[in-house]
Amino acid sequence: NLKKVNKKILTMSENQDETDKGEYKHFMFKEIVEQPYTVKNCIDEYVDSIKKNINILNFPIEPKNINKIVLIGCGTAYNSCLTAKYWFEELTSIDVEIDIASEFRYRKLKFNSNNLYIFVSQSGETADTAAALDICKKNNVKTCSIVNVIESTIARNSDWVLPIHAGIEIGVASTKAFLGQLTVLYILCLKLAFVRKDIE
């Protein structure tokens, strides 16, 4: 149709040096060794140790009004959601539900504007998770994504993004990303517990 299209240019945040195995024989071993740095990156990003404060701000819903948290993911991300469910139930007064994204897509769901739907994905491009997010957007509910790639589709389509800062991960076992997801979910859980006065 000869219409001019203005495309938005995104600069990728990854450091290409991370694609080198360096002194390690396998990427998986290298990434296991890098796990503590992932946790440190998350703590540095979200925790102010001097002021003793958790710097998670700009909630899409007033924390005290959150009725339920729905955690959605596939594979490794789903497993991190399973673990986080125990933390939210133990530390907060918020009801928690977990869904595998591929099943969430095809269920007859009742959406609530006071529910927070959290999508967990390393790449931010997981097809089923992205499709589940689209369903939530069409139903005008608030969404959050916990991803490693902040330029990804899931991150861009969410109301709120919490990066896990794991860096490039090549090993299929998803060692760094899993630990990063758990760390961010736990910090988020603590923040909600403090804000809602569930713990002092």
Where in the sequence are the language-model features?
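Glycine-rich phosphate-binding loops that contact phosphosugars or nucleotide phosphates
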Residues: 64-198
